[in-house]
Swiss-Prot record:
Organism: Sulfurihydrogenibium sp. (strain YO3AOP1)
GO annotations of cellular component type: cytosol
Family: Belongs to the Fmt family.
Keyword terms: Protein biosynthesis, Transferase
Top-level taxon in the UniProt lineage: Bacteria
Entries under InterPro entries matching the protein: Fmt (IPR005794), Formyl_trans_C (IPR005793), Formyl_transf_N (IPR002376), Formyl_transf_N_sf (IPR036477), Formyl_transferase-like_C_sf (IPR011034), Met-tRNA-FMT_C (IPR044135), Met-tRNA-FMT_N (IPR041711)
Keyword Nucleotide-binding in record: no
Reactions mediated catalytically: L-methionyl-tRNA(fMet) + (6R)-10-formyltetrahydrofolate = N-formyl-L-methionyl-tRNA(fMet) + (6S)-5,6,7,8-tetrahydrofolate + H(+)
Name this protein carries in UniProt: Methionyl-tRNA formyltransferase
Length: 311
């Protein structure tokens, strides 16, 4: 089939690569405009654009897609059999969704109808789920509410964070996408409506959600740290500075101390901090304008001692 691909970040690149390697033909790619990225804030192409250009696939980057006659005409000229959307970043209007023969499908990183919306991977980790998944669904006007072609479960382990789970879901989504497209082409697949009464929403992550409240349980804080490792990063005040906490582990402890208090600062083990119901061993932290370091190095470099407190 002739496929028009809509996508922007790294998550979408796996699906684009799988499409390029499949029997289907990618007739065009629509992605977000180039934006400043990285420390130097240089204008850079999106990851999807970079991949498409390697394969000489036409790339289009409209500033807006609503009421955009030019992009409508472009899509009609490309004449795709189906549009595939993977983390494009904007909601497509109905007039665009309905152009291709087989309409428009989406790779969504949750087990729908759970976690519709913008941040399904982070929310699944933050809420302590032990599994999530990917679904291929038909796009309709309502957000992530279309009929579902297929889903695959993915386990969330204690070792997973936003980076590892993102990659697992991107891989699984790409594999499932090709299977679904092959079956759509052969007319061998049915779609099923979602149970809308069971729908939950994964609202966008806000920067303020990175602030750690050490009176919460060790498990809740551990989930917060690993869910927000890319952005905004979990953080707490220490010596009047905002220190980011990038990696931690739940450990047993039976000492009485205030939440956030350092109960152990060991150059071999690291920093152990009291929480509402237990303790966390902090493994990697980052002081302002510094690189991430192990807590063993932080103890040596910043002379951190037991009795000090994260707030």
């Amino acid at each position: 089939m002739k496929v028009l691909f809509w996508g922007t970040p790294d998550f979408a690149v796996k699906s684009l690569k799988a499409l390029i390697e499949s029997n289907h033909q990618v007739v065009g790619v629509i992605t977000q405009p180039d934006k400043p990225r990285g420390r130097g804030q240089k204008i850079q192409p999106t990851p999807v654009k970079e991949e498409a250009l390697k394969h000489n696939i036409p790339v289009f980057q409209p500033e807006k897609i609503k009421n955009n006659q030019e992009i409508l005409e472009t899509i009609k000229k490309l004449n795709p059999d189906i549009s595939v959307v993977v983390a494009y970043g904007k909601i497509l209007p109905e007039e665009i969704i309905n152009i291709p023969k087989y309409k428009t499908i989406n790779v969504h990183a949750s087990l729908l109808p759970e976690y519709r919306g913008a941040a399904p991977i982070q929310r699944a980790i933050m809420e302590g789920k032990d599994k999530t998944g990917v679904c291929i669904m038909e796009i309709i006007k309502e957000l992530d509410a279309g009929d579902v072609y297929a889903c695959r479960e993915v386990e969330i382990t204690e070792d997973d964070d936003i980076i590892s789970l993102h990659d697992k879901l991107a891989e699984e989504g790409a594999r499932l996408l090709i299977k679904v497209l092959d079956k759509i082409e052969k007319g061998e697949i049915d779609k099923k409506p979602q149970d809308h009464e069971k729908a939950t929403y994964a609202k966008p992550i806000e920067k303020s959600e990175g602030k750690i409240d050490f009176s919460r349980s060790a498990k809740e804080i551990f989930n917060q740290i690993r869910a927000l490792k890319v952005w905004p990063k979990a953080y707490a005040k220490f010596r009047d500075e905002e220190v980011k906490i990038l990696d931690a582990k739940i450990v047993e402890c039976n000492l009485n101390a205030l939440p956030g208090e350092i109960i152990k600062a060991d150059e071999k083990e690291g920093i152990v901090v009291k929480t509402g119901d237990g303790c966390l061993l902090l493994k990697i932290i980052q002081f302002p304008n510094s690189k991430p370091i192990t807590t063993q190095d932080a103890i040596r470099g910043y002379k951190i001692k037991a009795g000090e407190r994260f707030e």
